[in-house]
């Protein structure tokens, strides 16, 4: 079989001088040179300097007649055979590998250089001292390694498939559990809704009863007052008529008339009976247990919901000059010594407070504040609206855009419209603040015991920012997620 180098050499001999590609429909002109028919036709169509002169051969410049070129069938057959040899040479490399450099069949493998060599390559100086093996002999240990790798990989694949099957079953079990829990949640909330609707019906029925009793007593009161008014009107009319009579008629039975008028007193009835008033006053107390239970339910629910840990840091641009911030902006300490801080618009100048660096505009977020009041003082934690007052006195209540609690030795206060002192089982020193922006919850819990502290409900429409305040020498806090 012809070597690849020989076939390549033959192919070069049947290239068209014009397009440099393999001859297609080769034709011969008068001088004996061969060209592609299409290439020569286009060449003849190019006008020369003298339109009447015959075109010249692109190789030897001999003139020829444009219509004189003849098909070269023998050359066409040669071109076809060479192309077949090229195809066979290319396809045969898988069965009979040929050295690209020498065109000889490859028989050997150099283990030093990991190269496949022909006889000529083996005798070359660079491989003369290397370890040579026949291809099959050299391939044998590699085949053994391949068999071992295949065995190991097949085993790994089986184990992977077993893991996949096992984990799919496990995930299916988990999906079933989630589905069951989903149904439980739906069922429990359906029961809760039913319970709340029943309680609502009971309370509304009681209020309806109070409405009816009030209206009944109002009607009775109006009727009584109307009777009293009529009796007084009759006496007034009698006295006015008596006063208009002559003296003899006026003096007739005057004493009994005056006694009757003087002894007539207004009974001064009350519109609402004391018993009904007490029922009205007692009604809010009947709703308080339900309110407390719902409040505890909401606060405990915060631990079950998926809150994203808020990685917050303190903003030194907002810090009051009496607050010392750590370099990592995770800790603050109260000091009576004023810091040399610029009076920028963001800074609190009266309230010893500081805000977090970034605000919150949506989602559920939670963070923990660890408080140290070993030397007294107090600490305030919560959230504020981004437009909270920074200059002058700051009133800590929801109407001013502040939702916070204050902790001091021995007590905790919820800073609502009116501060409320809270009753807790244990003084919290680590407070978890949980914010649900969309629902409008700001919940405070003891981060250690999970005891609910307080929950604010609000309707947020703008950015809110974590808020912290300190008062008292040595009081401090630090943040964690």
Curated annotation (Swiss-Prot):
Q: Where are the zinc fingers (RING-type)?
A: 16-61
Which of UniProt's keywords are assigned here?
Answer: Coiled coil, Cytoplasm, Metal-binding, Zinc, Zinc-finger
Q: Where in the cell is it found?
A: Cytoplasm
Task: Give the matching Gene3D superfamilies.
Answer: 2.60.120.920, Classic Zinc Finger (3.30.160.60), Zinc/RING finger domain, C3HC4 (zinc finger) (3.30.40.10)
Q: Which residues form a coiled coil?
A: 142-177
Q: Which residues form the B box-type zinc fingers?
A: 94-135
Keyword Zinc among record annotations: yes
What residues form the membrane-spanning segments? none
Q: Which PROSITE patterns match?
A: B302_SPRY, ZF_BBOX, ZF_RING_1, ZF_RING_2
* B30.2/SPRY domain residues: 292-481
- Top-level taxon: Eukaryota
Which SMART domains does this one have? BBOX, PRY, RING, SPRY
Q: Does the keyword Hydrolase apply?
A: no
CC annotations in GO = cytoplasm
Q: Which family does it belong to?
A: Belongs to the TRIM/RBCC family.
Q: Please describe the quaternary structure of this protein.
A: Interacts with IFNAR1; this interaction prevents association of IFNAR1 with TYK2.
Question: What's this protein's name?
Answer: Tripartite motif-containing protein 10
Instruction: Identify the coding gene.
Output: TRIM10
